[in-house]
């Protein structure tokens, strides 16, 4: 794998094999039996799938040393955000292309609540 060290590749392959084995050890439930029995089997299967998913995340963190939670993206305060188009009305890559946009009045169909 490009840009990775050999040791990291081995750890990644070990983690993938282990997670694949976990998922293969939990096949989907059989469609036989009463509706209630099928529902219970699906519910238990989904619970096991959730457990396998969380175990897989822990395996990835252990083998690859990644943080458990991603670093949150820092957004500016809402007070500083605006939708004012007066400073920069062009969109990137389209400035000067096509005809200039002319503001058009919206149709008067929705203005009155009575039919004519």
From Swiss-Prot:
The gene is rev. NDK, isolated from a Zairean patient infected with AIDS, and is a highly cytopathogenic strain. The keyword Transport applies. This is Protein Rev. Homomultimer; when bound to the RRE. Multimeric assembly is essential for activity and may involve XPO1. Binds to human KPNB1, XPO1, TNPO1, RANBP5 and IPO7. Interacts with the viral Integrase. Interacts with human KHDRBS1. Interacts with human NAP1; this interaction decreases Rev multimerization and stimulates its activity. Interacts with human DEAD-box helicases DDX3 and DDX24; these interactions may serve for viral RNA export to the cytoplasm and packaging, respectively. GO terms for molecular function: DNA-binding transcription factor activity; RNA binding. The modification Phosphoserine is found at residues 5, 8, 92, 99. Residues 36-48 have a biased composition (Basic residues). It is found in: Host nucleus, Host nucleolus; Host cytoplasm.
């Amino acid at each position: 794998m490009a840009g990775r060290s050999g040791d990291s590749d081995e750890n990644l392959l070990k983690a993938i094999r282990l997670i694949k084995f976990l998922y293969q050890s939990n096949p989907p439930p059989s469609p036989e039996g009463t509706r209630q029995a099928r529902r219970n089997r699906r519910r238990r299967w989904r619970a096991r799938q959730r457990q396998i998913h969380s175990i897989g995340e822990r395996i990835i963190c252990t083998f690859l040393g990644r943080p458990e939670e991603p670093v949150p993206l820092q957004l500016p305060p809402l007070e500083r955000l605006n939708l004012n188009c007066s400073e920069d009305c062009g969109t990137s890559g389209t400035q000067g292309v096509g005809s200039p946009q002319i503001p058009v009045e919206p149709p008067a169909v929705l203005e009155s609540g009575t039919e004519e």
